[in-house]
Curated annotation (Swiss-Prot):
Involved in the binding of tRNA to the ribosomes. PROSITE patterns: RIBOSOMAL_S10 (PS00361). Keywords: Cyanelle, Plastid, Ribonucleoprotein, Ribosomal protein. This is Small ribosomal subunit protein uS10c. GO terms for molecular function: RNA binding; structural constituent of ribosome.
Length: 105
């Protein structure tokens, strides 16, 4: 039954910085093209936004508040028919420290 299905690697990338994320996506797609794997993506997923509300004053003034937000940008890349060379190339990629990578087979 597994022979009827195509082998697929799904790479999910997360980052606070969208430019780092785009550069990482380009590196992964170039590595896949060099090893003759079919790359689909990057597919942008909705950006998650967390907002934190903090009182400005340490004492009174409940009306004076400050809002901070963290945006998490996400992308998905699917690789179809990867070879062992593709997997070796992907493991040797040097991605920036601000990018979280999750790989599913």
């Amino acid at each position: 039954m597994a022979s009827n299905q195509q082998l697929k690697i799904r790479i999910q990338l997360r980052s606070y910085d969208s430019s780092l994320l785009e550069n990482s996506c380009e590196q992964i797609i170039e590595a896949a093209k060099r090893t003759d794997a079919t790359a689909v993506g990057p597919i942008p997923l909705p950006t998650k936004k967390k907002i934190y509300c903090v009182l400005r004053s340490p004492h009174v003034d409940k009306d004076s508040r400050e809002h901070f937000e963290i945006r998490v940008h996400r992308r998905i890349i699917d690789l179809y028919l990867p070879s062992s060379k593709t997997i070796d190339t992907l493991t040797r990629l040097d991605l920036p420290a601000g990018v979280d990578v999750e790989v599913k087979l």
